[in-house]
């Protein structure tokens, strides 16, 4: 079927992606198709859906935010961890383009879709930063506080405490 064929053809593109051969991952190597061809030749397959995720993450890393948003918006997953990552990447792209409302919305989705001690604090931290940039100081304080209360073993804990204290100090003036 179409999906199995697309997945077989996408194998090499995934390999290139994992090896940081981004150009080959996107456009193929002349023998094997890249992610862009998979999306074009096999639309509405699971493989094309996954290719959208890879393409979006590549474009984001290349600071091509508009295309990153377009491809990531076309991706959806049943796996909560992968979908949360896609929401976080969308948040990053929207933050970079100055669309703070959409950045906040996507970071909220990333942080709340399936809480876990490794990724949720990262997504909450990004959400708090977006709140700060949007001038929503109380929401930022509250979000940093959530990291402080629930994720005290996380990498983000110390920075969240520091930023929360800084914002509380500014708010008190």
Regions found by a protein language model. Give the residues of each.
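Short solvent-exposed coil/turn linkers within tandem alpha-helical repeat scaffolds
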Residues: 39-48, 62, 76-84, 111-120, ...
